[in-house]
């Protein structure tokens, strides 16, 4: 049950962040929103919420609570909240999106359903 609960929390935050990502959105606010919800549930966001994608797979803007910049239309960035339980398991759900004036276009086409297969847990 703990894995399912953590998955649900990460997914809730991943989907909420997708609704926040748009031209002019505060990077700090998006990251703090996830950090605060994780903390309310007893977890930490131990890595940044995301980063830019362009000529390099990890480039500016780095989406974290220390970045005072805003997202701009036509940026390609990731949204990748994650929770990790050392020695036990971790959950990260990641999308790559194109920022637009009114929101974002999700470039990742994978399903986000939680599936259990043969006593192992698969996050798809």
Where are these regions (language model features)?
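Active-site neighborhoods and metal-handling regions in enzymes and metal-associated proteins
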Residues: 1-124
């Amino acid at each position: 049950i703990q894995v399912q609960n953590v998955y649900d929390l990460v997914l809730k935050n991943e989907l909420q962040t997708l609704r926040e990502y748009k031209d002019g959105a505060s990077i700090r606010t998006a990251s703090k929103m996830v950090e605060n919800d994780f903390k309310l549930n007893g977890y930490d966001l131990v890595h940044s919420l995301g980063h830019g994608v362009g000529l390099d797979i990890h480039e500016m803007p780095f989406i974290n609570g220390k970045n005072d910049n805003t997202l701009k239309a036509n940026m390609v960035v990731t949204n990748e909240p994650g929770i990790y339980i050392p020695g036990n398991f971790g959950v990260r759900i990641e999308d790559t999106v194109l920022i637009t004036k009114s929101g974002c276009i999700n470039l990742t086409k994978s399903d986000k359903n939680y599936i259990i297969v043969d006593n192992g847990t698969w996050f798809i």
